């Protein structure tokens, strides 16, 4: 689906595996801290896809899932504001299902759902919503990826999953 929206364009993918938005401890600087340098200051960037939050959810050991979700949302809002201020088109990607992953719990799932509900509510404030969660979810259990799209860790999509996402 995504490939139909951005055909014939160069793509600059500056995602970092295990990177986080709000909680230090993953690889590299927090996404919200490197957003200007890595994305907005790059020549020719016209559209930005923000697909963040799963590693922050996984890093949360306990507490209030709404608090974790609100921290992620606040960081995403900051990135959206910065991109819009620079006249970039902004697309938000929902957090994909991860039931079966090592850190999955009802607490973590509640945070994912909270963030995804917020992302979907932003359709009129951004240029598009990429509902990766809906695209990859198992129709029999929306907390889990379809087997044909899931890697063995149940957290990351496999090559077929990334292809379906247009990544």
How should these model regions be labeled?
Residues 5-6, 85, 123-124:
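Short, well-ordered coil/turn elements that cap or connect secondary structure elements
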Residues 76-84:
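Surface-exposed amphipathic alpha-helices with a cationic face
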Residues 9-15, 46-52, 88-94, 128-131, ...:
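Structural recognition of the beta-strand scaffold that forms the well-ordered cores
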Residues 47-49, 59-61, 83-87, 91-94, ...:
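Extended hydrophobic-aromatic, low-complexity segments
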Residues 40-41, 84, 120:
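Non-catalytic positions within long, well-ordered alpha-helices that form the structural scaffold/packing
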Residues 58, 95-167:
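Catalytic His-Asp segment of secreted/periplasmic serine-dependent ester chemistry enzymes
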Residues 34, 78, 114, 118:
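Short Gly/charged-rich anion-binding patches and loops
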């Amino acid at each position: 689906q995504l490939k139909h929206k951005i055909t014939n364009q160069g793509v600059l993918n500056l995602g970092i595996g295990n990177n986080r938005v709000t909680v230090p401890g993953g690889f590299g600087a927090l996404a919200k801290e490197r957003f200007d340098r890595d994305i907005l200051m790059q020549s020719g960037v016209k559209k930005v896809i923000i697909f963040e939050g799963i590693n922050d959810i996984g890093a949360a050991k306990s507490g209030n899932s709404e608090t974790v979700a609100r921290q992620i949302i606040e960081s995403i809002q900051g990135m959206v504001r910065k991109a819009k201020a620079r006249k970039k088109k902004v697309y938000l990607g929902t957090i994909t299902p991860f039931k079966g992953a090592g850190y999955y719990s009802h607490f973590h799932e509640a945070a994912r759902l909270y963030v995804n509900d917020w992302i979907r509510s932003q359709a009129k404030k951004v240029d598009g919503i990429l509902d990766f969660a809906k695209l990859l979810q198992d129709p029999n259990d929306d907390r889990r990826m379809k087997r044909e799209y899931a890697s063995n860790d149940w957290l990351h999509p496999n090559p077929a999953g990334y292809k379906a996402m247009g990544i």
